[in-house]
Amino acid sequence: MHNKLYLFILSLFVAISAAAQNIEITVKLGNEPAEYAFIFKNGCCLGNCDSLGRFEFQAGAIERGDSLMASVAGLSSDVVVYDGNARSVTLNVKSGELAGAKVVEKNLKRVDEYVSLVNSVPFEWRVFGRRFLCEYVIGEDSEISRKTADFTILDNYGKRYSKDKGDVLIYSFGNNIDDEKVGYDIFSSYVILGKILNRHSERLKDECTSGRMLVHKLSDDAGISYLLIDKSGDNSQILVRFGYRKELLDVCLEGNRNEEYGLEHYVWKITIAQNRKGPVRISGIELHGNMIATGKPKDVLVSEINDSPLTKADWKELKMAFVR
């Protein structure tokens, strides 16, 4: 009996000692925790924080001289060099570019992330074709005008709005902004969706290749990417990449929490300067293309894709869901 008690106390002591050696990283965006911010050690992304902005390194996983940085919504913290002794480190993400934006749609559980456009007009990025309300600001200092818009994200199959005829996403405001023209310059943006789901890749591959969810097709240096809308009712969005030999490269999902696949709610966004050339890669995913915002409401262009297995009924359902 005494031996069992001794072993229990010893194991408890070892567990407490091991936990005490862990290093906790806290990421803040202003005075608030930066939900699901990404943590970088020596330039490599190790994962993301929890909903309280916390990330924990196991004992020995970080050493003196390692550089730490956090990133969320295209914004980054200053680089902090670990001194080898601290048990906790706080990384502060600069939030100056995010002022003034707030999503007011009632069924959103939280404001995920913002993308800062040119002229510092932030907005919330959501699923293609989904409408929601967004507060935004235009102007600077005393000339700031705060508006609330019915905001729709549209895709552009026709490529008619792109100067270089590349893939373009159209962001369109609705009619409830007093017909004011709200437009921005074309800017480069790489939108990275989801979290790599290798453990579910084969299961999703069967659904994706059946074409039941196929909506958008992208080409890049790695092969073909398919952007899919899950028609099961949870408004999810899946990005699947296949190589030239039709081998599966990546599977990612953005949308509501999906218990069936055990998926968290992730949206990765990176906005880069116009003069940036080459793809941005995060965890093996990359997208190429430009985006433009326009003040004129436009329809989603849902067009046939070559060799698409979608039936006429599928296309009819897609058009009813996305064409306004």
Q: For each of these PLM feature ranges, what is it?
A:
Residues 7-17:
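Bacterial N-terminal signal peptides
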Residues 21-35:
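Structural motif
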Residues 30-31, 37-47, 73, 103-108:
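Short amphipathic beta-strand segments in non-cytosolic proteins
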Residues 44-56:
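Short, acidic Ser/Thr/Gly-rich low-complexity loop/linker segments typical of extracellular
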Residues 56-65:
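Short Pro-Gly-centered beta-turn/loop motif in secreted/extracellular proteins
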Residues 69-81:
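A short, solvent-exposed loop/turn motif at the edges and junctions
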Residues 87-227, 232-233, 239-324:
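Surface-exposed, low-complexity/disordered segments
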